[in-house]
Amino acid sequence: MENNITLEEIQNFKGKYPKQLWYLFLVEMWERFCFYGMRGVLAFFMVDQLGLVEGKANLQYGAIQAFVYAFTFIGGIFADKILGFKKSLLFGGIVMILGNLLIAASPHDFFYYGITLSIIGTGFFKPNVSSMVGELYHENDGRRDAGYGLFYAGINIGGMLGGAIPIYLGKNYSWSLCFLSAAIVMIIGVITFLLTKKHLAPIGNSPLEKHEPKKRNLYEIAVYVGSFVVIPFVYIMVINSDFTEYFMYTMGIVALLYFAYELIMLKDGKQQRKLLAAFVFIFGYFMFMAISEQSGGSLSLFAKDNLSNKLLFFHIDPNVVNNSINSLYVVIFSPLVGLLWIFMAKRKIEPNTVIKFGLSFVLLAAGFFIFYTARFFVNQDGLSSLDVFALGYLVYTLGELCIGPIGMSVITKLSPKRLFGMMMGLWFLSSAFGQFAAGKLGAEISDANTGTTLMSKLIAYTDGYYQLAVYSLVAGIALIVLTPLIRRLMQEVK
């Protein structure tokens, strides 16, 4: 049973946050535990347990992550046109649970089969929670950014726990327990959604509600069946990363054509300019992800072999630090950065959204430069300081905080309501291309190591991080220079 509450009543909430945001916060938190838990073990597991060389593992990692995010674009379209956000989320969550349970049954035998299910499930789940958050607010509600800030904190609490617990269980107990933990928290997330979705009332309902039930059910069943029909094809592409390029290029062309079609169909100059501005942010996010998403690939492998296990006065697994410290920093510093923007806004000196995007690249460059300096803190065994590594992540995270919480918010501000799902899908698709590019960059970093010692690996990897710092700095400066042009496209949107 759905509550009789109307959309207008939801959007006219009192206070800072609507209660529905807290429910979506919890659902997303558990799903992010599952996602980041898997992400944090991918490259490590493939090298340590499946015996892949590091360059190949980076490519495989990039391919898997690319498929995950590419399918969010497809899932967003099906949610927009047929299923609605609620049914899409529920279906995706169940498929993700099945994928993790399959791997947990026999990690070495069923790894790629389970990953295939997780890719499809995440595609249906991921874009929908953030889209429903956007619908909790009126178009010009100034509380929207604060809502996405809280939602972003939920993502990172899940990411922090997911980054630390599964890899710890896998390395110290069993890999079956590692993947089982991801399945268990996903079950909690799905149950949470089932118990609270009535409070969302019309938000996320099927766009085909007014169609006759028989016709609507036929469309929905076709989506579900089609999702399982493509499993063999996705599996083949996952185990053969050479196919990834063909898939990504095809997906990119289709996505651009579909975006162009929807842009033309708007037939409203103001809306078209706003949608073009949204596309600029989406492309910027692609560049950011291509550089920053080394954390699950090359940085994970760097932490595996080239970092000491001492952080300040504590002993801790470097891979636990690599997988979770970024999310920990986000939880700690996200509200502080939010307060900084408020402080600056009161004094009318807050940078606009485009400048914030540019600053994110500058800080990302500084973070990777600190990773590069790890070579100056190395001992005779080729182990560098975990403290320096953690400092690099702190600066890197401050850059992320300039783009992450406001990114999804600005996309929903610039997009017509009927295109929310597609534009959030494009946002995640840009991440898919970023993940794909990150895998290639990580593979180049690994392949540059022609030696056999930990010291030669450290030199090769830190050289790569220096190059990434340069790329990021150039991108940041370019965005800042182009700010006036992009602001004109955005019109009244801040």
Model-derived segments and spans:
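Intracellular loop-helix junctions on the cytosolic face of multi-pass helical membrane proteins
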Residues: 1-19, 139, 170-300, 304-310, ...
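Short amphipathic helix-loop junctions that connect adjacent transmembrane helices
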Residues: 38-58, 295-322
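Central cavity-lining transmembrane alpha-helices of secondary-active solute carriers
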Residues: 62-79, 126, 324-337
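Glycine-rich segments within core transmembrane alpha-helices of 12-TM secondary carriers
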Residues: 68, 143-163, 170-171, 183-189, ...
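Cytoplasmic membrane-interface "Motif A"-like loop-to-helix N-cap segments
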Residues: 81-93, 271, 343-362
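C-terminal ends and interior cores of transmembrane alpha-helices
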Residues: 91-112, 358-381
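Hydrophobic core of transmembrane alpha-helices in multi-pass small-molecule transporters
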Residues: 99, 110-125, 282, 380-402
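Intracellular juxtamembrane helix-capping segments at the cytosolic ends
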Residues: 124-138, 402-415
